[in-house]
C-alpha cells in the first residue's frame, strides 16, 4: 500500500468529511516532495507516453526571474538528484510531479506556465493565462470572490498541501479529456480512487507561486469502501456531475456496500 496517507495529520481524501472541496494544510518544507521509487518510475513512464500525443507545455507572460527561481528550486530541493538542465521543462520531465506556475501582479493573477502530462480532465492549453477564479469556476460550492487574496496567500505564505480525489475505472494516471473514460460496469467492476496531491510553494520576490501536482491510484484493496460510499451518498447532483458519477452513483454505492 502506498504510504501517501501515512503521514501524521494528513487528511484522507474522502474520509475526513468533505466530498468535493478540499482542505488546505500548511506543511513544513521537508514535506513538499514525496518520493516513492516504484511510483516515481510509473509516473515518468506515463508522462513520457503523454508527451507523444497531447499538448503538455504552455506558457503566457512568465517572467524570466520567476522561471529561473522555480528551475533552481526544483534542482536544489528535489529528493533525488536531477540532471541539470537549461530549460524548466527539461527539469520537470525528470520529476514525477506535473508543474503549474501562477503569477501575481498587483490585483492581476494568471496561470503563466504549465508542464502538465497527467491532467485530471482538463487541457493545459485552455487554462493558460486564466485567473484563479476562472480556473476553478466549474467546481460546485467553491467561493472565489477573494481569489486574488488566495493567490497572495499562496505566494507569500505556505507551503500548503491539499488532496483532490475522484473515482475512476481505468488503471492509469493520465485523464486527459481526449482519452475516453471507461464507465462503471456493475457486472465487471474495476474501481480505483485517483488522488491528486497539490502542493503550493510561494516565490514572493518573483511575484509568483508554484503548484506541484502528483497523481496516485488507490486500488480496490486500498479503498475504504464504507467511507467512500458515505461520501458519494452525501453529494448533491452538481457534485456528482462534477465527479463524473451522476449516471452510476446508486450502483456504485450499492457495490461498495455489498461486496
Regions flagged by a language model, labelled:
Residues 1-259:
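Extended, well-ordered protein cores
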